[in-house]
A protein has these predicted regions:
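Mid/C-terminal beta-alpha module of Rossmann-like enzyme folds, strongest
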Residues: 2, 201-265, 292, 296-317
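N-terminal Rossmann NAD(P)H-binding glycine-rich loop of SDR-like oxidoreductase domains
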Residues: 2-22
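Conserved Rossmann-fold NAD(P)-dependent oxidoreductase catalytic core, especially the SDR/UDP-sugar
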Residues: 27, 85-130, 149
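NAD(P)H-binding glycine-rich loop region in Rossmannoid oxidoreductase-like domains
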Residues: 34-94
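Conserved beta-loop-beta element that borders a ligand/cofactor-binding pocket
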Residues: 103, 135-160
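Glycine-rich "substrate-gating" loop/helix at the edge of Rossmann-like oxidoreductase active sites
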Residues: 154-164, 184-196, 220-222
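A conserved pocket-lining segment of Rossmann-fold NAD(P)-dependent short-chain dehydrogenase/reductase
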Residues: 172-193, 210-212
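Conserved C-terminal active-site "lid" loop/helix of NAD(P)H-dependent oxidoreductases
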Residues: 255-290
Length: 317
């Protein structure tokens, strides 16, 4: 049994598709799980609660920790260490392997491309929390107490409307024939991971004995575009003019006075003011899975949006 903790997010949705394609028995765990045709089990559980987490993981061989919390430092500080501790303890009791899907906040602001060897040097409160929980898991598998791995992603974009920055600022807007936005600096390259690539790599990593007890960067296209180039690609696929505005720090700070999510994102703007380059060559060399090019990923994302519009589905934003 392969169990997804936090099954309702963008990565969980894509991972479910991949595991079902591989004909794996799957258990979906979330606070309010929805029945999905072909899924073996759905379990309602609060993974910040240890007994509920233990019960949700029981009988699993592989557990994917994909939880997404409200974008709030106070909530992260309170819940993330507890969730990681619960997942570790539950996997130990079930003799299950743990895959943690992580981001790059713990690296802080880096000049060189990010790799698995980039040291943790967080420059944000959220980054400090991510460094703490990643370190706790690394200590577990390095000491031989748990079979686990970390699969790390850059910022990502999603083939259907979700809350990733690229989707909210670019795809959602162009789908509604509106002007797009970009954060801080549109002239520097910014890596994005395409979520179907991430999901495929998670399933592949979990199925490979040689992948365990280490950190992997999931496949992400090389030679990332600048903000301006990314917007032009998206506009072309939506058949609109590449009109956009660059959101400055002062503007974002003022907007944060009226919007909690914007206020919480302010400390992460360092990721947008200079080059943000994410390398995944370790994965490619080990497994040969190539990442989807930006041109193809943007095209598929636009096509998914257009299909939703034809079906009468609403676009957020």
């Amino acid at each position: 049994m392969q169990t997804i903790l936090g099954a309702g997010g963008a990565i969980g949705t894509e991972l479910l598709k991949e595991l079902m394609r591989r004909q794996q028995p799957v258990r979906l765990v979330s606070r309010n799980p929805k029945e999905v045709q072909g899924v073996t089990e759905t379990v309602a559980a609060d993974i910040s609660n240890l007994p509920q987490t233990i019960a949700a993981v029981a009988g699993s061989t592989v557990v994917y920790l994909l939880a997404g919390l409200k974008y709030d430092t106070k909530i992260w500080h309170e819940l993330w260490p507890r969730i990681m501790s619960n997942a570790i303890e539950a996997c130990k009791r079930a003799n299950a392997k743990l895959v943690f899907f992580d981001n790059v906040y713990m690296y802080g602001k880096v000049v060189a491309p990010m790799t698995e060897e980039t040291p943790f040097n967080p420059c944000s409160k959220k980054g400090e929390i991510r460094a703490q929980i990643a370190t706790s898991l690394i200590n577990e598998f390095k000491s031989g107490k748990l079979c686990a791995m970390i699969a790390r992603s850059a910022d990502f974009y999603v083939p259907d409307p979700r809350t990733s920055v690229a989707n909210v600022l670019v795809f959602d807007k162009f789908a509604k024939k509106q002007k797009a936005s970009w954060l801080i600096n549109d002239a520097v390259p910014h890596s994005y991971t395409y979520t179907p690539d991430a999901a495929k790599s998670l399933a592949l990593l979990a199925d490979s004995e040689s992948a365990w007890n280490q950190t992997w960067h999931v496949p992400t296209a090389p030679n990332p575009p600048t903000g301006k180039e990314f917007i032009r690609m998206a506009a072309k696929e939506f058949g609109v003019e590449p009109k956009y505005r660059v959101l400055s720090r002062p503007l974002i700070k003022v907007a944060g006075l009226f919007d909690t999510d914007i206020r919480e994102s302010y400390e992460m703007l360092y990721q947008s003011d200079s080059a943000y380059v994410f390398h995944s060559s370790k994965f490619t060399k080990a497994f040969g899975q190539e990442s989807t090019s930006y041109a193809d990923g943007v095209r598929c994302t636009a096509l998914a949006y257009q299909a939703r519009l034809r079906a009468g589905a609403a676009i957020s934003g």
